[in-house]
């Protein structure tokens, strides 16, 4: 039997969660006879032992004819069986691959369905910050048009219907996302192409359960989605009640300067800005609780990374992906109704003052992380690829 070949496209590789998942998939299927390639516009340093990384020519973008033709030519030259496009909904690229090659197409949605609407919604709110009239416009026009009238759903719906028609498989991260997507694109009674495959999380062989009294944030410091400022305000509410604890913020971004200024303005104690780190394992080893305060998340790998390291995750119940990872609350983590800082602070203090409860949840989250092992998730991708190739 000939070797089956899979090609992934990533703009930057490796870069974040989606790229890490691609490497986990490559590791699993390459051990079962597949040859895996990644085509990227920009290549960063990393371990590519399980796959071959190829670079698009300079100035070639997959949003333009030259880049699209490069992808098509790569598929032809390597005799690619399956082309996987994670995250980015580049319809002209999918159309070209569909029309000019025999490769099967997979679109992998690594976020919440219709994330584009949420992204635009919160970007507009971020731009209105500090401007009275723009803020008023956001509340009076943008908010009702987006949340009540769904005015901005229509073009996104058209795009995802087109993607669904073009591809052979469309992956989402949980069953709730599948149901939501089918409803949004008006296909409530079909949807055979949609496959539910969560993101993987590697097992930590030696979990350190002797944690410091340390709260942790890991991620990009951006206002429109991550809203780390909320965590600063939560810490402002509780830091005097938990005098032995500290807050460690790992990451960087456009918002960092404002966050540091906010900490100074509020005269907060025991807040550490640790900066960006490519390897965050030591922070998970040290910390007892991971805190996320995002507007929305698709399938936040920080939560599953925390669980794998025996770190208790707490987050707003903002999407089904977060709920899938942390539910039931108090067992696999802590879910907070969006976006109550008062409730978040209360639940956090209660947790920190109950060591026995912390120990119980730590054991639970380690077991929960095992359900997302690369072996279990890899089997799902392998089964999908085998079905497409038959």
Q: Model-predicted segments: where are they?
A:
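Conserved acidic donor-binding segment of nucleotide-sugar-dependent glycosyltransferases
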Residues: 327-342, 350-356
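A conserved mid-protein helix/loop that constitutes part of the nucleotide-sugar donor-binding site
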Residues: 19-24, 222-237, 254-260, 342
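Conserved donor-binding/catalytic core segment of Leloir-type glycosyltransferases
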Residues: 7, 206-226, 232-235
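A short, well-ordered alpha-helix in the C-terminal region of glycosyltransferases
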Residues: 283, 343, 357-371, 379-383
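Membrane-proximal helix-turn-helix segments that form the acceptor-binding/catalytic region
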Residues: 129-170
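Short His-centered aromatic/hydrophobic patch
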Residues: 85-91, 109-112
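Short hydrophobic beta-strand element within catalytic cores of glycosyltransferases
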Residues: 312-316
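Aromatic "clamp/platform" in nucleotide-sugar-dependent glycosyltransferases that forms part
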Residues: 276, 295
